[in-house]
């Protein structure tokens, strides 16, 4: 029952259309490149896409653009559910999982960056064009995610590199978008982190 309630909450869209196109484009970005991938690394099984689709629908995007944007979190699938698929793949090709994941991180990071223009096109098709200033900011967030994904494989166990890369950038993005307003809010944010 709890799983069904979580699924319903994820896909039942709130009415966020009144926020404006710029805010919706940022919501779409966060869903596709940060929250969706983070959720995918924690749970696997396409749950990142389920959560992303909930936000995408809440932004008023439907049909093919929603489906295409919703699939973007799957780029991080080698770390999905903490990476059992990568472990099996490494065993099959007789390569240490850390090495395979580190090599895959380069490919995933490049794919995230290369898919940005397609994402911007799909946002426009969905009624939320991304202006150049937003594109620059979004590219920096994706670059930070890609750099962390690659760099963390040198210092952390491969199973958590996707979670750490997406989680750190997601946290920074949310704090940047909604900074704490007072000392009490700062304490709550620090405790939550």
Labelled PLM ranges:
Residues 28-40, 143-153:
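Hydrophobic alpha-helical transmembrane segments and adjacent interfacial helices
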Residues 182-190:
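Membrane-interfacial entry segments at the cytosolic side of transmembrane helices
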Residues 86-181:
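Juxtamembrane and boundary regions of transmembrane helices in multi-pass small-molecule transporters
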Residues 5, 9, 53-54, 87, ...:
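Transmembrane alpha-helix boundary and packing residues in multipass membrane permease domains
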Residues 10-22, 95-97, 128-130:
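Flexible loop linkers connecting adjacent transmembrane helices
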Residues 31-111, 128-129:
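Hydrophobic transmembrane alpha-helices that form the pore/transport pathway of multi-pass ion
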Residues 24-29, 134, 138, 162, ...:
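Residue-level signature of transmembrane alpha-helical entry/exit and packing/kink sites
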Residues 1-14, 30-38, 189-193:
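Core transmembrane alpha-helical segments of multi-pass membrane transporters/permeases
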